[in-house]
Amino acid sequence: MSASMYGAGVEYALHSMLILATQSAPVSVSDLAGYQGIPERFLAKIFTRLKNARLVKGMEGVAGGFVLAKPAENIDVMEVLRAVDPGRSLFTCAEIRQNCALFGETPPGWAVSGPCRIHAFMEEAERKLQTFLASRTLADLVCEYSCKAPKKFARETEGWFLDRKKDRVARRQAGGSGEL
């Protein structure tokens, strides 16, 4: 397995927001984590970042949870990446061009003047990646996902979340904890 540019947090955020985009009611972090088999504490931290970036908003109460803060077609993938994994760069230049064994202690001006060509190349690649990610929305991902999954899967997913919410509300009304 190779190292990735973006961490698991980005994957968790995008999958969770995809779910929020397809649900008719707020969804709790606990339910999102349980549904996807991912760590709840980590997902809660991700949702704090998403909320601070105004991509999701929280709804209070035992039947509460999170909803998208704006329509899925108005949330681009780059916004999610910036919220969850801010400051991540495709490439970090260590300026090794000045360390060539042939240069000794003083590299010639031609070797170190201007920007490093490798760095400039990688910055261009990063700009193109960011432009692509900014051109794709959460709604695009929902559409692609919906085309792949059978129609009944959307109903089953909605039912799974509604059943969890009903169970939580019933436990709260019976005097137990509403949390799962």
Predicted regions and their residues:
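Alpha-helical residues within the helix-turn-helix
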Residues: 34, 51-52
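Key DNA-contact positions within bacterial/archaeal DNA-binding proteins
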Residues: 41
